[in-house]
């Protein structure tokens, strides 16, 4: 089971309202950003989201990062660059890189990430 907290908000940045996703980011103490690599960076909707968080002075949060790529993963590096500009952001040590598709091994990695995040509570 991947969801281990009763208070979780999930946003699909390609479909959901960006303002609501930003609001949810401020509502919770831990943010998990999951995005695909795109053109040696991060997928455009996530880039827009991170720019908005940066503009709104997002701070004092714990952030975990997950990327998906079929080759040349770059999303985590791009997301880290955004969060490094923000004040008092604690990046979770464990990151997850999913190559191509979700497998049982990646599910195990995501569960380990969830365990690490839950230790913060």
Question: What kind of region is each of these model predictions?
Answer:
Residues 3-14, 21-121:
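FMN-binding flavodoxin-like domain, especially the glycine-rich phosphate-binding loop
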